[in-house]
Amino acid sequence: MPRPNLEGIDGILSRLIAPHRHKPAFQLALVQRAWRSVLGSAAELKTRKLAFADGVVTAYLNSDSLRHELRAQRERLLEALREELRDELELTDLILK
């Protein structure tokens, strides 16, 4: 009896996701997940909106103190986001508003 062609769940999910990787909504979801992962839920609650276009992440923040702190650590934050998204997206810049 021939053995069935079994594929791992990661391979199946990769094939399902592949056509959507270049869609703006999918890329924004990846950025939002990375933002939450790098900064935590407290900073996420103070983030009004995230936008992503042409490699640039724009974060609209509700907190002036958080904006000031993140601007001081902007390069480190950008590197952490790049590391988090290393296999999925290329980030070129981070704008904090």
Task: Enumerate the predicted regions with their spans.
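N-terminal presequence-like segments and adjacent domain-start helices
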Residues: 1-37, 48-51, 68, 75, ...
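Short amphipathic beta-strand starts and helix->beta connectors
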Residues: 40-46
